[in-house]
Regions:
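Catalytic-histidine neighborhood of serine endopeptidases
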Residues: 64-113, 122-123, 204-209, 215-217, ...
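Conserved PDZ fold ligand-binding element
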Residues: 69-71, 195-199, 288-316, 405-428
């Protein structure tokens, strides 16, 4: 009888202890939820392109006390020209009623970390101070508990919600990621360790909805994401964020094609387990070419440090590119390369240039009457199309469905080299000559000579009747 009584007492003690721990855990979760919720907002803007208007919105995190908001670069794709993004807003959810709307400025994209930034352009309507969230570089071990707090879609009033999981694995592709077992809150949500420190951000995945103002955002609740990016990968953005009117100047090497060296090849070259990448091509007159880097060179070290290992050889070029993005234009970087099997490494000092203009910043023109748009060529166009570096023309960017241009057989990505028998130099000249011709001869066809897949063809666009 005494033994039974002792067992009952022991069981009661264990139950009481477990209940206390569960209560403490519940209390900690509620405190974290209450602390983090004011740091979560909605960022919203209008993408006004040639074909119409689309309102985009996603989750944002307050990262400074002056209203600087971080969000995923995926929401502000580099394929969207800056001039087409308008009406930026920050929405602050309220427990009851519609969210407060604040005008905002777009500070810019940060391709180094895959983040974008906005800042409030007017005071908060509720008169409250901003509550920035501080991220810390704290690694998580297998089996560690992690939590995330995200924002539900517009359909459920942007309410915040809490998720718990366990670290299952660490992955190293182009971007370092941590895999969890159960699931996390929606893309761009902050991730916390057991001490309540913000240690990462939920990764954006092709399978997960990024736009929280669309019905498909519910997918993130029904099938929660399981990957997050550790803070070590993006803290740079918070200490050196882009600023409105002053986009970040990114470094430029001029090596568009690289291949990760497979283990068997590395062994044959005597590199053993050392990660390496092989240069596939070097663009003429770029920093890499001027420094003497050659096709076939095998890069083994950067500034004396071995390349970072990826889970697969194919991950190495992406890892290398992201590492190079951490430097600044004008900095000197020493690349140690292997040129001949069994020979010592050759050190090549490269003074990094500034990344040339990209397609999203190229000047554009929209021929509304014929239903097509064009932009200036950029350096990468010449490289991808294997054109001479002095090739002139404009690139077709968009076609309106059932337009005169589409009906005539014009294709997106066509390179227009002639307009009505005259050479096309750039967007400015094309726009001027096109508008002049349409004003003077509105009933005559527009005749374009285009290059497509290495072949030249003529497209005759009859004016709409």
């Amino acid at each position: 009888m005494n033994r039974i009584r002792q067992c009952l007492i022991l069981t009661m003690v264990m139950v009481i202890g477990l209940s206390a721990r569960l209560a403490a855990a519940d209390d900690a979760a509620q405190k974290l939820y209450d602390r983090v919720t004011p740091s979560l907002v909605v960022v919203q803007y209008v993408w006004q392109n040639e074909l119409g208007r689309n309102e985009l919105a996603g989750a944002g995190i307050v990262v400074s006390d002056d209203g600087l908001i971080a969000t995923s670069l995926g929401l502000f794709s580099t394929q969207i020209p800056d001039e087409q993004m308008k009406d930026f807003k920050i929405l602050i959810p309220r427990a009851n009623g519609e969210p407060d709307e604040l005008k905002a400025t777009f500070e810019g994209r940060d391709e180094r970390t895959n983040l974008a930034f906005l800042k409030a352009a007017e005071p908060r309507k509720d008169k409250k101070a901003w509550t920035p969230l501080k991220f810390e570089d704290v690694p998580a071990a297998i089996g560690d508990k992690v939590t995330s707090i995200g924002m539900l879609p517009k359909l459920v009033a942007y309410k915040t919600y809490y998720m718990e999981s366990i670290v299952a694995a660490t992955l190293r592709g182009d971007v370092p990621q941590v895999l969890v077992g159960e699931g996390l809150a929606a893309a761009s949500s902050p991730v916390f360790n057991a001490d309540g420190k913000a240690i990462g951000m939920v990764a954006v995945s092709q399978a997960q909805a990024l736009l929280i103002n669309k019905p498909e955002a519910l997918v993130s609740i029904q099938a929660p994401p399981k990957l997050y990016v550790p803070a070590s990968d993006f803290l740079l953005s918070f200490s050196d964020p882009p600023k409105a009117g002053h986009p970040l100047k990114l470094p430029w090497l001029g090596i568009p094609e690289m291949t990760g060296v497979a283990k068997a090849v590395a062994d044959d070259l005597g590199l053993g387990d050392q990660p390496a990448i092989q240069v596939g091509d070097v663009i003429e007159d770029t920093p890499a070419a001027k420094a003497g880097l050659k096709q076939g060179d095998i890069i083994v070290k950067v500034n004396g440090q071995p390349l970072e290992r990826g889970d697969q050889a194919q991950d190495l070029p992406g890892i290398f590119r992201r590492r190079m993005l951490r430097f600044k234009p004008g900095e000197k970087v020493t690349l140690s390369v292997l040129r001949d099997k069994g020979q010592p490494l050759t050190d090549i000092a490269v003074v990094l240039g500034e990344q040339p203009p990209q397609s999203d910043t190229a000047a554009r023109f929209w021929a509304d009457d014929m239903g097509f748009g064009v932009r200036d060529m950029v350096l990468i166009d010449n490289y991808v199309r294997k054109l001479e570096k002095d090739q002139k023309g404009v690139i077709v960017t968009v076609l309106r469905k059932s337009s005169a241009a589409e009906s005539a057989g014009l294709h997106q990505e066509d390179l227009i080299t002639q307009l009505n028998g005259q050479p096309v130099t750039d967007e400015g000249e094309f726009a001027k000559d096109y508008k002049a011709f349409r004003d003077q001869k509105p009933h005559e066809a527009v005749v374009l000579v285009v290059q497509r897949d290495g072949q030249e063809t003529t497209v005759r666009i009859e004016p709409p009747q």
